[in-house]
Amino acid sequence: MSDWKNNPRDKSLLRQTWSDDFEQLYTLGSDIYLYIFNQVPACKGLFPWISKYEAEGRNFAEGAEFRAQALRFVQTISHVVKNVYHMERLEGFLYDIGQRHVQYASRGFKPEHWDVFQDAMQAALSNRMNTHPELSMDDRQRAIVIWRDIALYIILHMKEGYNDGLKGINRFPVRVIM
């Protein structure tokens, strides 16, 4: 990981390249999930409503369930951005999300899916940087590096929570609510 956590300019660039606009958030979340489903179609099985849509010949990406899931994912990213000046608050929050994903192992969630989620975040966030014409080329490239590190940070702590959860370990037994 780069040194963005200790660099005020990088933190400012991170916030500058983030938007809480509903449509932008939905588009980002959709891009993340569509990337995941294209890379690992079996991940669709984690969401029972997808097979229902597909059996009916409907596009699951147009359904309310997909929209809600896409927004749920980007809310986590948004929470990280809002707390970028207080990173110590985030570890338990992300770890807890990983712990909760243990319940999806019965639906086919596998530890290697975390890597696909990380790749999807990195790809979608990198593509999003191209929608910022106000950034210099250097700032755009730096933002891509910072967002890559954010994706790594998020997944690293979620994966740790998930792996510990599989072993019955919880380093943060009091649920972190932020």
Tell where the protein language model's regions lie, with residue ranges.
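Globin-like tetrapyrrole-binding proteins
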Residues: 1-178
